[in-house]
Structures are given as C-alpha cells and as structure tokens.
Amino acid sequence: MGCGEVYFPPKMFCNNEGRESRMEDVFFGESLGEIYTASVNRHPTTKFEYLEAPFSMYVSFRADGGRVMVSGRLTDFRASLDEIGIGGFIGEGVVPRFRRVYDDGLIHYSRLSFSLLDDYYETHLARDLEPVVPGGTPSERPGIVGYGAYVPKYRIRVEEVAEASGKNPDLYRGVVKEKALPFLDEDTRTFAVEAAERAMFHAGADKNTVDVVSVGTESNPYAVYPVAVSVAEACGIPSSVNSYDARFACKAATSQFGLMIGAIQAGIYRNTLVIGSDNSQARPGDALDYSVGAGAAALLLGGEGVIATLDGVAHYSSDTPDFYRREGERYPSHGGRFTGEQAYFRTVVSAGKSLLERTGLSSGDFDYFVAHQPNMKFPRSAARALGFEKDQYELGNAVDYIGNMYAGSCIAGLCAILDVAKPSERIMMVAYGSGAGSDAYVFTVTDEIEGKRERAITLSGQIFNPRREYVSYQFYRRAKDQ
C-alpha cells in the first residue's frame, strides 16, 4: 500500500471516520445536555470509591445540526441503589459542572460531571439571555460590574453537630442555625469557578477583557499550586491574564478591592475578577465545628457598566494571633474568647469608625451595612457598636443559614444586599481577617444595577432553595475532610 492511501475505508455511520478522519476541539462546558443512557456502578474502581456508587451516563449535546455524545457522571446525587430507576433519568436535562474527578496525588478536575437541570442549582445557561452585553456605560468611578455567589446544595443543622459531639444543642443554637458543606467532589477550586462564572454572566462582560483573576482563600487543596490559574482556564479567560492567590485569613479577597480599583482607574487593567472561596476547616468537636461553612463569592470590578461605585476605603491592622494554622497542621487553632473583644470587635469597629471619619459620613447616611460573619452574634454586635439599626444590617447576615464561608463570607453578604439594592443606595462593608485586619468600604449603587437584575442568581434563592438536602454528621465530616 502506497503512502497517502486510505487503510481503513470510511464507515457508513460517520463521514469523518477512517484513516482520513479528523478531530476537532468542541467545548460543551457552557451548554445544556440531555441524559441519553445511564448506569449505576455498584462496585466502582478504587479511584472513585469516595463516590460510593457513581451514576455514569452518556450526555447528548446538539452540535452542527446533529448530536454529540459525551461520557460523564451525575454529581450532587445521593440515593439508595434500590431506589434508582434508570428509565426515569433518560431525557432529563443536565448542566456541566467543574468538579474533582479523582486524586492520585494530583487532584484531577473536569467538566465531565453533570447536575440535573431541575435540581437545586439554578444555572444562567437555562436563561434566554446573551452571555455578553456590549457597550457598558463608562463610569467616573470604577466599582462593581457584576457579582455572583455559590452555596453548595448540602446542609447540616447545628443540632446535628452538637448531638454528634455529645453536647447540649441548646448551647449552640446562637452560633448558626445551619450551614453549607461541599459534596464529595467539591472543594475551594470548584466553588471559585462557580462563583466566577456567575459574576461574569451577571456583568455581561467579555471574558477577553478580564485582566486579573485573584482568589482569596485559606483552604487551597494544595500548599503550592494556586487556585486562580484553575479558575481562569476553566472559565475560558485568556492566558494573558494575571492570575494569583491572596492570603489573609477571611479578608484575603477583600484586601484586593482597593488595589484593583486603583489599577483600573490608572488604566492598567480593564476588568478584574476577585473571588473569596473556602471549604472552611475545623477540628471535629471544636467550637469552630459548629460554624464553618463552604462556598464562594466573586466580584467583577471595572470601569464600564458599574452597578456600584467604590467611594471610600479604610483599613485597620494589628499583630493579633486570634486564629492561626501552622504549616503542616490540618486544622486551625484559635484563642477562644480572645477572638471576640480583643480581635474581631476591636478591629472591625476601628476600621468602621476610620471609614466614617475619612468620608465624613455617619451610620444614618447608609442604607445597608455588612461585616464579616464568623457567627450570628458578632456581625450584629459590631453593626450596633457602629450605630447601625437592624433594618440596615439584617439583610447582609447570611451566616445564619450557610455558616462562615471564611474568605467568601463578607462578599456573600454584600451579594445578598446587591440582590435587592436600589440606585443611589449606599452600602458600608467591613471585612475581617484573623491575624488581624479589616478592610472597610463604601459602595454606592448606580442605575446600571436595574438592567442586570434578571442576570443574577440570588443568594436567598440558594439559601432557601427547597431542594437543599440535609445530611448526617458522618457525611459532613467525610465531605469536609476529603
């Protein structure tokens, strides 16, 4: 047979099959699919034992007038093997999710995991809206262009944690009511991708205009290997982006706001994506075990299509080791009662007062107040200490139902406010990070927010979603410690 001749004749079922066939990259990560066929792996291989009984399937996607089949598995799904009827899933719509696949020292991620379209997760892919909205109005002051928060589907009530630890549940009901936890294939990276995608869709921004991806976290699955690079690539942001992780406990993300706004104002960057993401850690039975949550929140900052301008900044820092984790230790340590008055309250209130002094404003000049939320009591007490009333601070307190999201906590509270805030309303935000420091900001809502209202996936819609699922303490610890 001579060079260039066809060795395998084309097969009838595919015009591109055979020696002369070709392959091309096709990305379905931002497309809805349908379950074509499925099976339950009752005895998974070692790599997938953590999922117990993976639900494998072929997902059908429309492409060029035909269909393409992609193999994957169903995620965020827990059911007894005896309860699963495969036939009921055929034809169901599914959404690609960026999740962990397996861990062999290197954690492997992909979008070959799918959640059911009508499950807990609302997706912008199901909305009849263009992903990019051109021609955002330039703003005199840079600020927030879009926002997005991600809270996992699974929850545990604080009573469940107390009973598992042999404690009286009544003693802990003032910490949080319930809290979010990851599924077995979720972590800080997957949370960050979800929040980033929501923020960019809400903004209607072209991914090619995102010049920075910054992720604040204290629960990166790796000691060395930044979360931000995974977010940028998974979200389709060009490789020319400046990607990096930031660290300062729970204010790791908010500490970037002023720096990013300054760079945007100077013309160095166009849009910057700042994300706070954490699978908050706590030693089993420790006081933190009652409050730690999971999830992420993201802001796209820029100078066009701004929904809230940044109009004031103040900071406060001191060498206060109220909360820390030594290198090589799995769980953080804390100073117990020392974390309150001497750390959180002194720092948050000082930063808040400094902001009011620098801007010449008073608590009565604000419509909303949000602070870092380690538990239900602290942010409310700090708000009152700064002169705020309940109708100003209550909306931003999401901790009651999702727990302390660490680096995502304060931003998630801000997202809850932006979900309902009206043009000209003013927001004061005071973040906190153990060690210790606070970032205080003034945001003023603009008319642009109304045009993006239908693009938001609201925080309350996730917190109170009727499809959220409650789990046992054993499942909670397993998901936390994966």
Regions found by a protein language model. Give the residues of each.
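Cys/His-rich short segments
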Residues: 1-32, 482
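Extended interfacial segments that mediate partner engagement and assembly in macromolecular machines
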Residues: 21-82
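Short, charged beta-turn/beta-strand-edge "cap" motif at the junction between a beta-strand
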Residues: 41-42, 94-105, 433-435
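Short nucleic-acid-contacting surface segments enriched for D/E, G, S/T with interspersed K/R
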Residues: 76-97
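OB-fold/S1-family single-stranded nucleic acid-binding modules
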Residues: 97-128
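Condensing-enzyme catalytic core mediating Claisen C-C bond formation in acyl metabolism
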Residues: 127-186, 286-342, 346, 435, ...
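Claisen-condensing/thiolase-fold acyl-transfer catalytic domains that form or cleave C-C bonds
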Residues: 129, 193, 219-220, 238-240, ...
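Phosphate/pyrophosphate-binding loops at sites that engage ATP/ADP/AMP, CoA/4′-phosphopantetheine
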Residues: 195-211, 349-365, 386, 421
